[in-house]
Amino acid sequence: MAENDVDNELLDYEDDEVETAAGGDGAEAPAKKDVKGSYVSIHSSGFRDFLLKPELLRAIVDCGFEHPSEVQHECIPQAILGMDVLCQAKSGMGKTAVFVLATLQQLEPVTGQVSVLVMCHTRELAFQISKEYERFSKYMPNVKVAVFFGGLSIKKDEEVLKKNCPHIVVGTPGRILALARNKSLNLKHIKHFILDECDKMLEQLDMRRDVQEIFRMTPHEKQVMMFSATLSKEIRPVCRKFMQDPMEIFVDDETKLTLHGLQQYYVKLKDNEKNRKLFDLLDVLEFNQVVIFVKSVQRCIALAQLLVEQNFPAIAIHRGMPQEERLSRYQQFKDFQRRILVATNLFGRGMDIERVNIAFNYDMPEDSDTYLHRVARAGRFGTKGLAITFVSDENDAKILNDVQDRFEVNISELPDEIDISSYIEQTR
């Protein structure tokens, strides 16, 4: 792959794996783990009002969720009745929990049959969704979950499907199609078909073709749900073609960037001044965890190394590293073993790290969509956060203006001092 593709590629998608089995080691569905988290409390009514199974309610309590978010409040009652759902809501609003809870509520596990298929565009997101299924099905011991994606051996996936067939399959379209084509994965019993970050899969024509082929292998009668943070007017009709009279929920219009509690600033500087400024800011700002976004694999490696040399505990995640290494580092950061993550766009979409309260755009994102998904890493789950963008040339300034125009926000220059209470929870 050309370096330019590596730098700019948001999507982690191997088209060729449909034809050929990828090499490398595989992993079976990991054992269930208890992970803490908390969503923003918007509605006073609790999850109990949805009349969910007691096993689900117990898991929800264990996760520390008390009240459904706005999108959960809007979607879950209809989703658990089996309605088709098309939902757009900003990052950090708990969209994943909507389809995880709705499918687990309706699931009646049958040995040897896959009932739920969830697809997304990156391996990391697939891995994370499978973890969500594991934590919410904690008290449903009969429910089996497996995750399949490229970069790991397809033989291991075939083994899992043969010997320990899951009821819920999460994966990327390329690998799912490869498994369905070679008859390892039987889609004849699918009752729930879900696309997360659906626009990313349906905008790419090759990925859309894969999704369509997989869709045609599933029964006509099934529930279809699609979710994304950005759903353009052009892509909505494409989504509807997969659905029958869907309930459409657009929790906040794409013209508004209202990430509650997120302070956004920019810093004007030359490219060669970025490191010094970054170190100064990391020295003075209070943070739980920080994500720093860069535009290329080389810059990612170099900056992470530089931070470690300056005694900042940094870890890097980029497209150039093997899949196992990437997932292991993602888990290390999530488990709070490191407080600073340097990443390429690969990490920018859909990843939930609850302690992140500062996001840096060390390099300007290529468009306003990418800006939204990057800065949404900070201030998720209704917590406060800070986003700082470095602007080093006219093109950077143009993109920042696009962001302000599109989302109708005013991003001001970083002041000399920032009130700590504006971007960090004081009670922690």
From Swiss-Prot:
Biased composition (Acidic residues): 1-19
Cellular compartment(s): Nucleus; Nucleus speckle; Cytoplasm
SUPFAM superfamilies with a match to the protein in the record: P-loop containing nucleoside triphosphate hydrolases (SSF52540)
GO MF annotations, alphabetized: ATP binding; ATP hydrolysis activity; ATP-dependent activity, acting on RNA; ATP-dependent protein binding; identical protein binding; mRNA binding; RNA binding; RNA helicase activity
Covalent link location (Glycyl lysine isopeptide (Lys-Gly) (interchain with G-Cter in SUMO2)): 36
Enzyme class: hydrolase
Residue numbers bearing the Phosphothreonine modification: 172
Record-linked PROSITE patterns: HELICASE_ATP_BIND_1, HELICASE_CTER, Q_MOTIF
Primary localization: nucleus
Listed SMART domains: DEXDc (SM00487), HELICc (SM00490)
Residue ranges constituting the Helicase ATP-binding domain according to the UniProt record: 76-249
UniProtKB keywords: Acetylation, ATP-binding, Cytoplasm, Helicase, Hydrolase, Isopeptide bond, mRNA processing, mRNA splicing, mRNA transport, Nucleotide-binding, Nucleus, Phosphoprotein, RNA-binding, Spliceosome, Transport, Ubl conjugation
Residue pairs linked by disulfide bridges in the UniProt entry: none
Annotated ATP binding sites: 89-96
Modified residues (N-acetylalanine): 2
Quaternary assembly: Homodimer, and heterodimer with DDX39A. DDX39B interacts with the THO subcomplex to form the THO-DDX39B complex which multimerizes into a 28-subunit tetrameric assembly. Component of the transcription/export (TREX) complex at least composed of ALYREF/THOC4, DDX39B, SARNP/CIP29, CHTOP and the THO subcomplex; in the complex interacts with THOC2. THOC1-THOC2-THOC3-DDX39B subcomplex is sufficient for the interaction with export factor NXF1-NXT1. TREX seems to have a dynamic structure involving ATP-dependent remodeling.
Similarity section: Belongs to the DEAD box helicase family. DECD subfamily.
UniProt name for this protein: Spliceosome RNA helicase DDX39B
Gene source species: Homo sapiens
